[in-house]
Amino acid sequence: MWPLLTMHITQLNRECLLHLFSFLDKDSRKSLARTCSQLHDVFEDPALWSLLHFRSLTELQKDNFLLGPALRSLSICWHSSRVQVCSIEDWLKSAFQRSICSRHESLVNDFLLRVCDRLSAVRSPRRREAPAPSSGTPIAVGPKSPRWGGPDHSEFADLRSGVTGARAAARRGLGSLRAERPSETPPAPGVSWGPPPPGAPVVISVKQEEGKQGRTGRRSHRAAPPCGFARTRVCPPTFPGADAFPQ
């Protein structure tokens, strides 16, 4: 009789540990990651994301998984018994079927947009829906698998490019504003910073003089100082009591 050989879980290589983690639920993954540092490193490995199997789309709303900054590709695959509903053409669906698919689509869209906004390294987020296997055991279904009966939903791969394009446009606009802004230099000694202070109001003195021929009411206007922009600005008009101002 051959002796019974035992192997501890930590003796498995990284690939086997990632495969085991991919089939655990969220509570089991977190509990197993707390046992030792080696399993905790596997739990934080970004490669685990490409192996996860979701039982339903509602798992995407919870903080079940850790997204690392080194994650570059995100492929979400879940197994649904309603894949035959989501994979048919939209014009062939009933109102009830459209309502089901719209909830799926909006949930995944919002989740992927949040992931793209938080992780700048993500390049190609995608989602896939696979038919539920008859045996009840989750299986990984790729885009070329014969069991895959629907489209690859490649339109979700453009989410990252759209977010990246918006960020690039914002950076270009901010850069152009900074380029057009004049460089600010400190003022020279004795020169005040900012616009010049407003000066004294311009007063036009009006006096009455009596001529030799007895004519009264002749007015002599003092020349007013220039206003700076003679063609665009108008000097203030004369008003009663202007002689009371100091000369």
Curated annotation (Swiss-Prot):
Span of domain F-box: 6-52
Transmembrane region(s): none
Gene3D superfamilies named among the record's database cross-references: 1.20.1280.50
UniProt-recorded Gene Ontology molecular function terms: ubiquitin protein ligase activity
Annotated compartments: Cytoplasm, Myofibril, Sarcomere, Z line
UniProt superkingdom: Eukaryota
Tissue expression: Enriched in cardiac muscle.
Subunit structure of this chain's protein: Directly interacts with SKP1 and CUL1.
Protein name: F-box and leucine-rich protein 22
Native source species: Homo sapiens
Gene: FBXL22
